[in-house]
Amino acid sequence: MNQLSAEMIKAGIVALAVFAGCAYDEPPPPAINVQQPAASLTGLLESVGARLSYRLDLPARHGKVPAVVIGHGSGRVTKDACRFLAAGFLARGFAALCYDKRGVGESTGEYSSVGPRNSDRMFEALGEDMAAGVRFLRSHDAIDEARIGLVGGSQAGWIIPVAAAKVKPAFMILLVGPTVSVGEEIFYSAIVEKTAAPLEDGYKRLPTVTGERGFDPRPLLETLDVPGLWLLGAKDRSIPTPETVMILDRLAAQGRPFSHVVFPEAGHDLSGSPYWEAIDRWLARTPTLGVALLGNTAVQRK
């Protein structure tokens, strides 16, 4: 058995730990004076093989409002895990839909940690859950069905393209979302996240990955015409940021409407980075979405 194969086996052994307890759960609290929702509605969403317990927070605005469906990172997470992202979008005039991950909290269905062998099946199911959220919002009287987006981080970076292919949202925002395969992410993080190895070691050795790759988002991303923003940390020890950027640049050169921002001092949690400012700038120049921010006094910088 060669050294690389041995490392891939080691990576497979730690895969459950990587995906069940990733350093990213959610970005830090938004740097805003957060308003409370004008209303919070709860209920159950029907998805394929699951019923999802949701909370829909609505802003204090007249008329139909834009909205986001917030997807989860790895682990057994509930709707409460997206509270900071929801608050940030609420302050920007968006409604925010959060839900318990399938098989977690009050949601039914199968929960499973994700690795290369089951990633295609699990991301199909989790993508269907996000798509169900979009379909629900499109039927809601308070929501502008033409301005519904998908938002999420880490593992959600794989799930969002699956959902986007199903329902064609108005936009997608992916925080520290990988564009490499599951197997490549595990290989990279096994080298640098669980050891003191320099990030450059992971970058240099990534092309030598062996073993199962599992889900790969690149074929889906090559087909998507959905405006997308990736927010990345240059010091991320979970996903290989340079490879992610290279893939996004290649896709943008092919005409995909994708942008990215790399924060030089940020890791996988984006802690200390001005990611909300980046989101604001991108939303303001994305057709039909910038209007959501106009005249919104809830967004006040500290």
Name each model feature, range by range.
Residues 90-110:
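Conserved alpha/beta-hydrolase
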Residues 27-61:
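N-terminal cap/lid segment of alpha/beta-hydrolase-fold proteins
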Residues 166-204:
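Hydrolase active-site cap/lid region
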Residues 224, 230-232:
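Short beta-strand/loop motif that positions the catalytic acidic residue
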Residues 266-302:
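Catalytic active-site module of serine/aspartate enzymes centered on a nucleophile-bearing elbow/loop
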Residues 118-140:
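Alpha/beta-hydrolase active-site loop
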Residues 75-86, 101:
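The serine-hydrolase catalytic nucleophile loop
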Residues 226, 240-250:
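Short alpha-helix in the alpha/beta-hydrolase fold that links the catalytic acid
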